[in-house]
Amino acid sequence: MMQYDLATMGNHDFDNGIDGFYAQLPHAKFDFVSANYDFKNTILNDIVKPYKIIIKDGIKIGIFGLGVQLDGLVDKKLYKETVYNNPIEVAQDMTRILKEEKKCDLVICLSHLGFKYKDEPEKPSDILLAQKTKNIDLIIGGHTHTFLDKPVIEKNSEGKDVLINQVGCFGLNLGRIDFYLSDNNEVINKGKNIIV
């Protein structure tokens, strides 16, 4: 049976307030990561971590989460003292930690920023995240409910490829992305599929 390894948080996770989200955590059989929401003065402090490292078949995978600006989407009384930090700046720090300090073979961002915003090109999005950072191999996106029939390849700040995928919403579609690594765990190829 398929299961989750990890999830990030988005605006709808606050629909029943931060206390409502906290009350549901015992039902989740996986952890939550969010690097740009600072929960230090909330009940989620020390529960939602900025990143997690998972080892699968000897491959060290660093995964971090990013969430959308809550102000204007969610009533302040629902997210309380949660502080939103610039996701692009936070991502640069996360990738440095995961790739350079922790020596992860793959770095994945679970994003709830949205794919892109035509009318607001400088608003943090998956496209902007890929372009303005380095060391992210894959961005798995949400928020804008964008259905991509195949992942988008965007160049990062060093001119290297970053895969961005978003498969719509409501669990209607599944995405699958395979990374092929050499014997010394360097990415040599990326395979992409969408399962409808």
Say what each PLM segment does.
Residues 1-195:
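Acidic, metal/ion-coordinating pockets
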